[in-house]
Amino acid sequence: MPAIRLFDTAAGHEVLLESGDRPSMYVCGITPYDATHMGHAASYVAFDLLNRAWRDAGKDVDYVQNVTDVDDPLLERATATNVDWRDLAQSQIDLFQTDMEALNVLSPDHYVGAVESISLIVPQVERLVSQGLAYTVPGTNGEPDGDVYYDVEAAGKQSVAPDAWSLGSISGLSESEMLELFAERGGDPGRSGKRQALDPLLWRVARDGEPSWPGASLGDGRPGWHIECTVIAQKYLPAPFTVQGGGSDLIFPHHEMGAGHAYSLAGVPLARHYAHAGMVGLDGEKMSKSKGNLVLVSKLRAAGENPAAIRLAILAHHYRSDWSWTDEGFAAAKADLAAWRRALDHAPQGSAAALVEEMRAALAADLDAPAAVAAVSRWARQANDGGAPASAPDQALVRDAVDALLGVRL
């Protein structure tokens, strides 16, 4: 495997991943409801490619993924469907993991829930309060006192080191852009009593009808979204770890704020690099839970579709691109998969090594799966056109390499 280059969102350009012998990666996991839609699948397949590329290079990879197993959308769905939120979360986690296994996505070394991490999160929020980087907000309109918020302005001034975090370090967004996205993605810019509109929640004190946990000096409650990932990553990975991954909708506020929390707590960046997968639509429209147009992996599998074809349909698109799932694209992926499998019976002698090198070069160039897929398709056309009996060594090498590098089982 050549040296891997990856587009770093924070840097704004491709970078060479200098990860040593043990690269490390954290990919933000699902909030367990409506799993696993195609946007989820595309994101985890994308970072599975990086995991596979590193492993192909002979490296031991430390990979951590969380699951946001308590959060407002989950609680709202549980209430709407009259299901206990814990049962809903567990059923969706089980479904997600089954879907990932079907898609041949390598499992993380640590799959960590927010709930099980609360005892780790509480003292870290207390530290931020004691450092003067977090503060409590009085309740209004019947809300209780004591919600804890992160002071982004104070945090941005805590260090003048070249790698220090300040608001915008990861996203590169303007304040107006941040405010718009903050409101759309779970933030509360209009909350009374906050020092800055963009200050994110660290600890939500207990409310009637909501689950809560002991918070020591914070009072009973539950953690905010961003601090969960920060604490889990700092627990299980080195500081800084190699790559923080996720969908592009996580750049702001989630990854921006998580990076700030981490620097405030450890004095070093959370991650060396930030990489993000594009968004997936359906037939040209944004795919969203609110629109009810989610394409679910489990429903495709239940309809008898081959998970390898689903994965191949995803790999036809560069991981950073925004794209739409279409029947035509899926049909093309199924046709490609069939052609690849036929070609194994006609693998030309001496053809496999060059194909493997093409695939490796493509993945090393910012995980260019479409180029790798195109290389396999060219090889398959030549093999099928030739029609000769297969060379057993080439047949085996192609089958193993397509599985190891692209995660497509032939």
Curated annotation (Swiss-Prot):
Monomer. GO terms for cellular component: cytosol. It is an enzyme of class 6 (ligase). Binds 1 zinc ion per subunit. It comes from Pseudarthrobacter chlorophenolicus (strain ATCC 700700 / DSM 12829 / CIP 107037 / JCM 12360 / KCTC 9906 / NCIMB 13794 / A6) (Arthrobacter chlorophenolicus). Its cofactor is Zn(2+). Keywords: ATP-binding, Ligase, Metal-binding, Nucleotide-binding, Zinc. Catalyzes the ATP-dependent condensation of GlcN-Ins and L-cysteine to form L-Cys-GlcN-Ins. A motif ('ERGGDP' region) lies at residues 184-189. This is L-cysteine:1D-myo-inositol 2-amino-2-deoxy-alpha-D-glucopyranoside ligase. The lineage of its organism: Bacteria, Bacillati, Actinomycetota, Actinomycetes, Micrococcales. Its EC number is 6.3.1.13. Belongs to the class-I aminoacyl-tRNA synthetase family. MshC subfamily. NCBIfam families: mycothiol_MshC. L-cysteinyl-5'-AMP binds at C28, G29, I30, T31, S43, N66, V67, T68, W225, G247, S248, D249, V280. The keyword Transmembrane does not apply. InterPro entries: Cys-tRNA/MSH_ligase, Mycothiol_ligase_MshC, Rossmann-like_a/b/a_fold, tRNA-synt_1_cat_dom. Signal peptide: none annotated. GO terms for molecular function: ATP binding; cysteine-glucosaminylinositol ligase activity; cysteine-tRNA ligase activity; zinc ion binding. It catalyses: 1D-myo-inositol 2-amino-2-deoxy-alpha-D-glucopyranoside + L-cysteine + ATP = 1D-myo-inositol 2-(L-cysteinylamino)-2-deoxy-alpha-D-glucopyranoside + AMP + diphosphate + H(+). A motif ('HIGH' region) lies at residues 30-40.
